[in-house]
């Protein structure tokens, strides 16, 4: 297996899901995928750009009788010797052999020259002065300065002393060796491969229930909770572990032999008979892929059952080759047909019961929900920021044939984790963040249409706008390229050992240096380090032990939200003082109790507060002594979940809808500029003469009426003291 050092992929890449086509002339979609692949690769900064030089102190007391040895040596003579030293090719060659490249050489030489030419030469190392004197008299060659230069360089850049050790510590090319418990077992690997709604997970879960001891690893806590509930309902005691909670079938003194968990919570030390790893294709995920790689290589079980897309089969086999494990593949076909409609929806009046409009932003969810309400259709709503309870409640309303909410508007969060009786999946757009949907993502979403054993067994996929339908058909017709790279992440032990050699480096600097010098093999890319670094920057000035800091920085927090990021920093600061993060302290910070949401901004505030409570519960699982009030905070989160449910129920009042628009304006807003124009306008920034609101109007579907309403809300906020 080839070893690739130096430049690494930090934030994952789309290379594993956007491989170039084997055909001579790639399609437009493959070309765009290749471009996305190139643009998504983040190169690690070179180590010489990361290290900070240290000041080398002069000797405080000169050796007696130095004048006799150095004679008439002065700074001018020293400068001449140093200039000649710097120009020697042999000196540069020796420097490179010791890890000092050209950029580091210039920085180290500048420091060395400053050290050698102070106003008072008596403060310089006597041995160096004697050599300088001999060189100036022609008795010695300037290349003999190299040992002094190298010693000085290692004082200026301490990492040079430990480069070999740092490279060994940060070697990520053999992750199989990180899991001795799994390597002590001759494991049987079964791959249940098939599309959505093929029954692949069902067959793996049958083996889960039959085993004497088993663990289910799901991608979401919603799915882990569903398996937990269903297993216990079948009379098989099963515990639940997610990042935020642990629940027992009986009690914590009597753990069950069956466990349902999120994939990150799998213990690689626990020996069981069966482990089921769902959605194995998530290996390619740029943020969480490391967890599936870890589960695949580290699960200590006699049988490993993998469920997922066929695109992951080859990479799974390659990952297991070095340890001599083979894979038995079992293929499953979709149980009910999925067809692509010949016509787009085009008008909200064509929406029917069982339809699901899939959007790729919360704003688009709000917009489409408003238009449906204006057409007399009350939709259920699901998007990523909603708490699990609210998502389940909205899913239940949509699935209930007697409920008036028989249409769903959702983000691509419905791609996994929720059982939904969808007849038609309607793509509101074929782009996500101005980029075309990759084929595997479009198939995952479209596959939610039609559910075996329900009234909507036959699924249909289409688009809202007719100009998108051809694009969707082309995307879905593309072959899903086999996954070629999977995520990997450094362990805490590696980071800790790394820090021993660089005791003065901050945690942010440690992460940067680790990524710069580490090695990964061709089948891996580094993920999570970028997200971890964002959190590390937030608490860089907070004095925390390394283990605590590392744990804080691995928490699943959305740093894009400034409020939750600010609360995260406050939690870290209080932790650093040794004060417990109590329920009273947390509630005071959140200005509890919250007010019911009467606007979208107030609903968003409730969602942010829920994320803060979620963060508290996540940390309390790891530091129960410092965050002692997890039960009370969990009760508060349930209250908040219910308030958010109520807010979503009163969706139209939150949208502050005015009089209905005429049908012509509605139809006009259904049309959208081409994907090329959309991508171009998204990159345009407002000029000084244009307002931010006008710029937003140009690059979104916001209507003039929506804009007036937005201005009105902003003016109200501005008038508040």
From Swiss-Prot:
Report the transmembrane regions from the record.
none
Q: What keywords were assigned to this record?
A: ATP-binding, Coiled coil, Helicase, Hydrolase, Mitochondrion, Nucleotide-binding, Nucleus, Transit peptide
Q: Where in the cell is it found?
A: Mitochondrion matrix; Nucleus
* Reaction(s) catalysed by this chain's protein: ATP + H2O = ADP + phosphate + H(+)
| Residue intervals of the Helicase C-terminal domain | 343-499
Similarity comment:
Belongs to the helicase family.
Native species: Caenorhabditis briggsae
Coiled-coil annotation reads 692-720
Name assigned to this protein: ATP-dependent RNA helicase SUV3 homolog, mitochondrial
Entry GO CC: mitochondrial degradosome; mitochondrial matrix; nucleus
Comp. bias regions, Basic and acidic residues: 663-687
Asked if the Swiss-Prot or TrEMBL record annotates the protein with the keyword ATP-binding, the reply is yes
As for what it does, the entry says:
ATPase and DNA/RNA helicase able to unwind DNA/DNA, DNA/RNA and RNA/RNA duplexes in the 5'-3' direction.
Please, which domain of life does this record's source organism belong to? Eukaryota
User: What InterPro entries does the record point to?
Assistant: DEXQc_SUV3, Helicase_ATP-bd, Helicase_C-like, P-loop_NTPase, RNA-DNA_Helicase, SUV3_C, Suv3_C_1, Suv3_DEXQc
Q: Where is the Helicase ATP-binding domain?
A: 181-319
Where mainly located? mitochondrion
Q: What class of enzyme is it?
A: hydrolase
The alphabetized list of GO BP terms reads:
mitochondrial RNA 3'-end processing
Cofactors required: Mg(2+); Mn(2+)
Where is this protein's transit peptide? 1-29
Matching entries from Gene3D superfamilies are given as: 1.10.1740.140, 1.20.272.40, 1.20.58.1080, P-loop containing nucleotide triphosphate hydrolases (3.40.50.300)
